[in-house]
Amino acid sequence: MGKIKAIIYYIYFVLSVFVVIFFMAIKNSSHRHFRRIWAKFQRYFLRYKIEIIGTPDENANMIILNHQSIIDIVVMEEIHKANLSWIAKKEIARIPIIGKIITLPKMIAIDRSNPRDLVRVLHEVEDRIENNRVIAMFPEGTRRKGNKLLKFQTGAKVITEKLKLKVQPVVLLGTREILDSHNFCANFFGNVKVVYLPLVDTTDKDWLEKTRSKMQEILDENLYEDSNELPDANKNLNQIKTDKISEK
Protein backbone atom coordinates (compact mmCIF):
# COMPACT_ATOMS: atom_id res chain seq x y z
CA MET A 1 0.00 0.00 0.00
CA GLY A 2 2.87 2.34 0.81
CA LYS A 3 4.29 1.91 -2.70
CA ILE A 4 0.93 2.71 -4.29
CA LYS A 5 0.74 5.85 -2.18
CA ALA A 6 4.27 6.76 -3.28
CA ILE A 7 3.31 6.41 -6.96
CA ILE A 8 0.24 8.57 -6.42
CA TYR A 9 2.24 11.20 -4.58
CA TYR A 10 5.10 11.34 -7.08
CA ILE A 11 2.62 11.89 -9.91
CA TYR A 12 1.03 14.68 -7.90
CA PHE A 13 4.45 16.09 -7.01
CA VAL A 14 5.68 16.26 -10.61
CA LEU A 15 2.45 17.84 -11.83
CA SER A 16 2.55 20.39 -9.02
CA VAL A 17 6.16 21.26 -9.90
CA PHE A 18 5.06 21.98 -13.48
CA VAL A 19 2.34 24.27 -12.13
CA VAL A 20 4.62 26.24 -9.82
CA ILE A 21 7.24 26.58 -12.58
CA PHE A 22 4.55 28.01 -14.85
CA PHE A 23 3.51 30.63 -12.30
CA MET A 24 7.11 31.55 -11.47
CA ALA A 25 7.83 31.99 -15.17
CA ILE A 26 4.97 34.41 -15.72
CA LYS A 27 5.44 36.43 -12.53
CA ASN A 28 9.10 36.84 -11.69
CA SER A 29 8.57 38.96 -8.58
CA SER A 30 6.48 36.38 -6.70
CA HIS A 31 8.70 33.28 -6.69
CA ARG A 32 8.80 33.00 -2.90
CA HIS A 33 5.03 33.37 -2.62
CA PHE A 34 4.36 30.65 -5.18
CA ARG A 35 6.86 28.26 -3.60
CA ARG A 36 5.27 28.65 -0.18
CA ILE A 37 1.80 27.98 -1.56
CA TRP A 38 3.18 24.96 -3.43
CA ALA A 39 4.71 23.62 -0.20
CA LYS A 40 1.42 24.03 1.67
CA PHE A 41 -0.39 22.04 -1.00
CA GLN A 42 2.13 19.21 -0.56
CA ARG A 43 1.23 19.12 3.14
CA TYR A 44 -2.48 19.23 2.39
CA PHE A 45 -2.07 16.27 0.03
CA LEU A 46 0.04 14.16 2.40
CA ARG A 47 -1.90 15.30 5.49
CA TYR A 48 1.06 15.59 7.85
CA LYS A 49 1.46 17.95 10.81
CA ILE A 50 4.49 20.10 11.57
CA GLU A 51 5.81 21.02 15.01
CA ILE A 52 8.51 23.67 15.31
CA ILE A 53 10.90 23.84 18.27
CA GLY A 54 13.20 26.82 18.62
CA THR A 55 13.23 29.91 16.45
CA PRO A 56 14.91 30.85 13.18
CA ASP A 57 17.72 33.27 13.98
CA GLU A 58 17.27 36.47 12.00
CA ASN A 59 21.05 36.91 11.87
CA ALA A 60 21.64 33.55 10.19
CA ASN A 61 22.43 33.72 6.50
CA MET A 62 22.92 29.98 6.13
CA ILE A 63 21.03 27.01 7.50
CA ILE A 64 22.40 23.46 7.37
CA LEU A 65 20.06 20.50 7.64
CA ASN A 66 20.05 16.73 7.86
CA HIS A 67 18.62 15.06 4.76
CA GLN A 68 16.10 12.21 4.95
CA SER A 69 13.52 12.91 2.26
CA ILE A 70 12.45 15.35 -0.42
CA ILE A 71 9.86 16.41 2.15
CA ASP A 72 12.73 18.14 4.01
CA ILE A 73 12.76 20.83 1.32
CA VAL A 74 8.97 21.04 1.17
CA VAL A 75 8.69 21.59 4.93
CA MET A 76 11.35 24.31 5.04
CA GLU A 77 9.88 26.11 2.03
CA GLU A 78 6.62 26.39 3.93
CA ILE A 79 7.77 27.34 7.43
CA HIS A 80 11.00 29.31 7.06
CA LYS A 81 10.33 33.03 6.90
CA ALA A 82 13.35 33.90 4.78
CA ASN A 83 13.59 33.42 1.03
CA LEU A 84 15.76 30.32 0.87
CA SER A 85 18.31 29.64 -1.84
CA TRP A 86 19.04 25.92 -1.87
CA ILE A 87 22.37 24.47 -2.91
CA ALA A 88 21.43 21.49 -5.06
CA LYS A 89 23.04 18.94 -7.35
CA LYS A 90 23.68 20.26 -10.85
CA GLU A 91 22.03 17.14 -12.28
CA ILE A 92 18.64 18.40 -11.07
CA ALA A 93 19.05 21.72 -12.87
CA ARG A 94 19.78 19.83 -16.11
CA ILE A 95 16.48 17.94 -16.13
CA PRO A 96 14.26 19.36 -18.91
CA ILE A 97 11.51 21.61 -17.54
CA ILE A 98 11.83 20.22 -13.98
CA GLY A 99 15.26 21.86 -13.75
CA LYS A 100 13.55 25.25 -13.91
CA ILE A 101 12.62 24.74 -10.26
CA ILE A 102 16.32 25.40 -9.61
CA THR A 103 17.12 28.07 -12.19
CA LEU A 104 14.00 30.27 -12.11
CA PRO A 105 14.09 31.11 -8.37
CA LYS A 106 17.89 31.36 -8.47
CA MET A 107 18.78 28.34 -6.43
CA ILE A 108 22.44 27.31 -6.65
CA ALA A 109 23.43 24.22 -8.62
CA ILE A 110 26.79 22.66 -7.79
CA ASP A 111 28.83 20.19 -9.81
CA ARG A 112 30.08 17.86 -7.10
CA SER A 113 32.39 16.06 -9.53
CA ASN A 114 34.33 19.27 -10.20
CA PRO A 115 36.08 20.80 -7.14
CA ARG A 116 36.81 23.98 -9.12
CA ASP A 117 33.08 24.63 -9.41
CA LEU A 118 33.18 25.75 -5.78
CA VAL A 119 34.64 29.09 -6.92
CA ARG A 120 31.52 29.82 -8.97
CA VAL A 121 29.31 28.64 -6.11
CA LEU A 122 31.03 31.06 -3.73
CA HIS A 123 30.21 33.96 -6.06
CA GLU A 124 26.59 32.84 -6.34
CA VAL A 125 26.23 32.43 -2.58
CA GLU A 126 27.60 35.93 -2.08
CA ASP A 127 25.14 37.29 -4.65
CA ARG A 128 22.14 35.62 -2.99
CA ILE A 129 23.09 36.92 0.45
CA GLU A 130 23.47 40.44 -0.93
CA ASN A 131 19.88 40.05 -2.14
CA ASN A 132 18.65 39.08 1.33
CA ARG A 133 18.41 35.36 0.64
CA VAL A 134 19.32 32.69 3.19
CA ILE A 135 21.43 29.80 1.92
CA ALA A 136 20.15 26.30 2.68
CA MET A 137 22.22 23.18 2.23
CA PHE A 138 22.51 19.56 3.25
CA PRO A 139 26.14 19.05 4.33
CA GLU A 140 25.71 15.28 4.06
CA GLY A 141 25.45 15.79 0.31
CA THR A 142 22.75 13.17 -0.22
CA ARG A 143 19.91 11.36 1.52
CA ARG A 144 20.96 8.59 3.88
CA LYS A 145 19.29 5.23 4.50
CA GLY A 146 19.85 4.80 8.24
CA ASN A 147 19.55 7.00 11.31
CA LYS A 148 23.21 8.00 11.47
CA LEU A 149 24.27 11.21 9.77
CA LEU A 150 26.71 10.81 6.93
CA LYS A 151 30.04 12.60 7.15
CA PHE A 152 29.56 16.32 6.49
CA GLN A 153 31.21 17.45 3.27
CA THR A 154 33.80 20.21 3.49
CA GLY A 155 31.91 22.47 1.06
CA ALA A 156 29.76 23.87 3.88
CA LYS A 157 32.87 24.71 5.89
CA VAL A 158 34.66 26.35 2.95
CA ILE A 159 31.66 28.48 1.97
CA THR A 160 31.01 29.54 5.56
CA GLU A 161 34.58 30.50 6.37
CA LYS A 162 35.35 32.18 3.04
CA LEU A 163 32.28 34.40 3.24
CA LYS A 164 32.14 34.64 7.05
CA LEU A 165 28.57 33.38 7.20
CA LYS A 166 26.43 32.95 10.29
CA VAL A 167 25.20 29.37 10.38
CA GLN A 168 22.15 27.93 12.10
CA PRO A 169 21.71 24.13 12.22
CA VAL A 170 18.23 22.70 11.73
CA VAL A 171 17.24 19.12 12.50
CA LEU A 172 14.29 17.53 10.73
CA LEU A 173 12.56 14.49 12.22
CA GLY A 174 9.83 12.32 10.75
CA THR A 175 10.09 13.33 7.09
CA ARG A 176 11.33 9.91 5.97
CA GLU A 177 8.29 8.34 7.62
CA ILE A 178 6.14 10.50 5.33
CA LEU A 179 8.07 9.79 2.12
CA ASP A 180 10.89 7.27 1.92
CA SER A 181 12.50 7.38 -1.52
CA HIS A 182 14.99 4.59 -0.74
CA ASN A 183 12.20 2.09 -0.08
CA PHE A 184 9.76 3.88 -2.40
CA CYS A 185 7.09 4.19 0.26
CA ALA A 186 4.73 6.99 1.29
CA ASN A 187 2.41 7.43 4.26
CA PHE A 188 -0.45 9.87 4.31
CA PHE A 189 -0.78 11.50 7.73
CA GLY A 190 2.14 11.72 10.13
CA ASN A 191 4.17 14.16 12.18
CA VAL A 192 7.23 16.18 11.27
CA LYS A 193 9.33 17.98 13.84
CA VAL A 194 11.68 20.86 13.02
CA VAL A 195 14.31 21.79 15.61
CA TYR A 196 16.19 25.08 15.26
CA LEU A 197 19.50 25.02 17.14
CA PRO A 198 21.51 28.11 18.19
CA LEU A 199 23.95 29.78 15.83
CA VAL A 200 27.23 27.92 15.43
CA ASP A 201 30.52 29.31 16.73
CA THR A 202 32.41 29.14 13.45
CA THR A 203 35.63 30.44 15.04
CA ASP A 204 36.11 26.93 16.42
CA LYS A 205 38.15 25.03 13.83
CA ASP A 206 36.13 21.87 14.55
CA TRP A 207 32.75 23.59 14.32
CA LEU A 208 31.42 21.45 11.46
CA GLU A 209 32.06 18.11 13.15
CA LYS A 210 30.80 19.42 16.51
CA THR A 211 27.64 20.62 14.81
CA ARG A 212 27.19 17.21 13.24
CA SER A 213 27.48 15.64 16.71
CA LYS A 214 24.84 17.97 18.16
CA MET A 215 22.49 17.23 15.29
CA GLN A 216 23.06 13.50 15.77
CA GLU A 217 22.12 13.86 19.45
CA ILE A 218 18.77 15.29 18.41
CA LEU A 219 18.18 12.40 16.02
CA ASP A 220 19.19 9.83 18.64
CA GLU A 221 16.64 11.24 21.07
CA ASN A 222 13.83 10.51 18.59
CA LEU A 223 12.47 13.95 19.35
CA TYR A 224 9.45 13.52 17.12
CA GLU A 225 8.19 10.79 19.52
CA ASP A 226 8.60 12.84 22.70
CA SER A 227 7.73 16.50 22.26
CA ASN A 228 7.89 17.26 26.00
CA GLU A 229 11.61 16.77 26.54
CA LEU A 230 14.44 18.44 24.66
CA PRO A 231 17.77 16.70 24.17
CA ASP A 232 20.91 18.12 25.76
CA ALA A 233 22.03 19.65 22.47
CA ASN A 234 19.10 22.05 22.60
CA LYS A 235 18.79 22.79 26.34
CA ASN A 236 21.00 25.88 26.09
CA LEU A 237 18.37 27.78 24.18
CA ASN A 238 17.26 30.77 26.23
CA GLN A 239 13.69 30.34 25.10
CA ILE A 240 11.95 27.48 23.37
CA LYS A 241 9.07 28.40 21.14
CA THR A 242 6.90 25.59 19.86
CA ASP A 243 4.47 26.10 17.01
CA LYS A 244 2.19 23.47 15.57
CA ILE A 245 0.99 23.51 12.00
CA SER A 246 -1.88 21.12 11.39
CA GLU A 247 -3.12 19.65 8.19
CA LYS A 248 -6.12 21.96 8.26
Predicted regions and their residues:
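Membrane-embedded segments
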Residues: 73-124
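Short, basic/glycine-rich phosphate-binding loops at helix/coil junctions
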Residues: 18-19, 100-105, 190, 194-195
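Residue-level detector of anion-binding/catalytic polar loops
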Residues: 49, 85, 108, 134, ...
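A transmembrane-helix-recognition feature enriched in membrane-embedded lipid enzymes
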Residues: 1-51, 100-101
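Short, basic, glycine/proline-bearing loop/turn elements
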Residues: 37-39, 60-61, 104-111, 142
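Short acidic-hydrophobic, aromatic-tinged amphipathic segments that line or gate anion-handling sites
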Residues: 52, 108-111, 202
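Non-catalytic C-terminal accessory region of glycerolipid acyltransferases
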Residues: 120-248
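Conserved H-X4-D acyltransferase segment
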Residues: 35-88
